Regions:
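Gly/Ser/Thr/Ala-enriched C-terminal appendages of enzymes
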Residues: 62, 68, 74-76, 97-100, ...
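Buried, small/hydrophobic-residue-enriched core segments of structured protein domains
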Residues: 1-228, 248-250
Length: 373
């Protein structure tokens, strides 16, 4: 439940920036990819957590979570994808081919002539890959029936993706602390400017790849389109994913920075790892299980609760039978109920009772989850 609630926040973030910068939301189910399995405490914990992620996203490398859903929920139609993944390299694959990054990329392009695949690209020199290797392979990449996804895996995520020189989408001129001035012309191209006798004199852009960031460099090499909201969308043959040190706050910073640079949020995918899904306790979201009601042998009903006088109210628990009802303000808890009260409006459904499971379909769970966004 905790992982599902966290995934929900990532989904809301993706929805928010898609609404601001994109023409459609097709990318959202795949914008946050579950990278957490290798950092979880056990196979079992990765399954439970991964199932929560799959409530809001379909991209996952925690494949056992898909099996878990098939095991614990009613079977989904074979045409219904619970979760998906793609071929992706890691550092030992890249270093096994020697120091020549171009040869490694050529090998991978031969290995995967079609479809989507991801390549970790910072094993040796990330900015060399971005500024030299990829431009040299541009024609091969653009002629593929599929997408090559570039994955940086070190450095400051915001700087790597968005660059270290910030130029706002709606301001034409910005002076940096270094004294340099940059100008964005009408088609979005960044150029250096200097102050002359007749005002600003526009020069060529002298920013380094590091200053531009990955997304802008990919745009310069591969191009793309400008959507109806005025934001740039990379060519469909190239993309980017970042999965190192991603948090909800950092993901928001990246999406905000891309927006300020004039790029749609669909240009980046986040790998959400075990720091997000493992580094939690029952207190992260205040989650606990309590007994609140009992029926004695003679049929008498008793409220079970605690309300310590030495507490500030945090440990005070619900009492009696409880239900959750849907109101105009959202879901609300109703307590102090007895077994004879009306529970027809209770949103909580029995899934396990007295040793018997009452399975539901994963599709219905997805519908409830997404309708609550």
């Amino acid at each position: 439940m905790t992982s599902a609630s966290i995934a929900r926040q990532y989904r809301k973030l993706a929805e928010d920036y898609s609404e601001k910068t994109c023409d459609n939301s097709y990318h959202i189910p795949y914008q946050c990819h579950d990278f957490s399995m290798r950092g979880m405490s056990s196979l079992e914990s990765s399954v439970w957590s991964g199932m929560g992620h799959l409530l809001y996203f379909k991209g996952t490398d925690t494949i056992p979570a898909i099996i878990g859903i098939e095991q614990f929920y009613e079977p989904a139609p074979k045409s219904y994808p619970i979760g998906t993944s793609i071929p992706a390299t890691e550092h030992s694959v890249m270093s096994s081919h020697g120091l020549d990054d171009k040869k490694t990329f050529e090998f991978l392009l031969d290995l995967y002539p079609t479809g989507i695949f991801s390549v970790v690209s910072d094993t040796y020199d990330f900015w060399k890959v971005v500024s030299k290797v990829l431009p040299e392979l541009k024609d091969r990449i653009l002629s593929r029936d599929g997408k090559l996804v570039i994955r940086p895996d070190s450095g400051d995520p915001v700087d790597i993706i968005c660059g270290t020189v910030s130029l706002h989408h709606h301001s034409h001129v910005q002076a940096l602390k270094s004294g340099r001035i940059y100008y964005r012309d009408e088609d979005g191209t960044i150029k250096k400017a200097v102050r002359g006798e007749n005002g600003l004199e526009i020069l060529e852009d002298d920013r380094t790849p590091e200053q531009k960031g990955l997304i802008e460099c990919l745009w310069e090499t591969f191009g793309g389109t400008v959507n109806s909201k005025g934001f740039k969308v990379l060519d469909s043959h190239i993309g980017a994913i970042y999965g190192d040190s991603i948090t909800l706050e950092r993901a928001e910073h990246i999406l905000s920075s891309l927006r300020s640079k004039g790029f749609a949020s669909s240009n980046i995918v986040f790998g959400v790892g075990s720091y997000t899904y493992q580094y939690n306790t029952r207190d992260t979201l205040g989650f606990a299980v309590k007994s609140t009601h009992r029926i004695a042998k003679d049929g008498s009903e008793y409220f079970i609760f605690k309300d310590p006088k030495t507490d500030n109210g945090v440990k005070k628990s619900a009492k009696g039978m409880v239900k959750v009802v849907l109101t105009e303000q959202g879901y609300e808890l109703v307590d102090k109920l007895k077994s004879t009260d009306d529970f027809s409006d209770d949103e909580m459904k029995v899934v396990f009772k007295d040793g018997t499971a009452y399975p539901t379909s994963f599709e219905s769970v997805l519908d409830r989850a997404n309708n609550s966004l």
